[in-house]
């Protein structure tokens, strides 16, 4: 309960921004030394979402949806999704990929609203994993 006190005066938007910082740092750390999920280049990686975080908020913090991706693919090629998909299935397997797609289909039927407690859990989980 004491940990949550430091987040008491933060808005949901502020909590989401903090969660993004810690989650993306974890993804970059997890995929450090690996090639870009889309083009295979070895360069500085960003946290690239297969399903965009803006259009699909329910999988914004799903580790199967976010992988190390170079700036060129992530930003200039809008995710470079065709090779991303092929390499993603190879990396996580067809079963986990199908589960990710199912989550997307189910989420399309509902409006997603961020929960303060969920965001605090994300912040604390990835803060700990980044140590």
Please provide the spans of the model-predicted regions.
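Short Cys/His-centered divalent metal-binding micro-motifs
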Residues: 44, 66-92
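Short Cys/His-rich Zn2+-coordinating modules
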Residues: 15-26, 50-56
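Short, surface-exposed acidic
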Residues: 92-102
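Short cysteine-rich loop/turn motifs with clustered Cys
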Residues: 20-46, 70
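Short cysteine/histidine-rich metal-coordination sites, predominantly Zn2+-binding motifs
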Residues: 51-58, 85-93
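Histidine-centered nuclease catalytic patch
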Residues: 37-66
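A boundary/linker detector
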Residues: 1-22, 43, 101-131
């Amino acid at each position: 309960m004491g940990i949550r006190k430091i987040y008491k005066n933060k808005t949901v938007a502020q909590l989401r921004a903090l969660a993004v910082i810690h989650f993306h740092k974890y993804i970059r750390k997890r995929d450090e030394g690996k090639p870009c999920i889309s083009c295979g280049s070895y360069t500085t990686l960003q946290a690239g979402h297969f399903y965009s975080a803006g259009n699909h908020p329910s999988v914004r913090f799903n580790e199967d949806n976010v992988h190390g991706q170079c700036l060129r693919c992530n930003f200039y090629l809008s995710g470079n999704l065709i090779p991303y998909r092929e390499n993603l299935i190879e990396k996580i397997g067809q079963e986990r990929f199908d589960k990710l797609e199912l989550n997307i289909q189910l989420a399309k039927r509902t409006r997603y609203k961020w929960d303060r407690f969920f965001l605090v859990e994300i912040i604390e989980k990835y803060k700990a994993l980044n140590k």
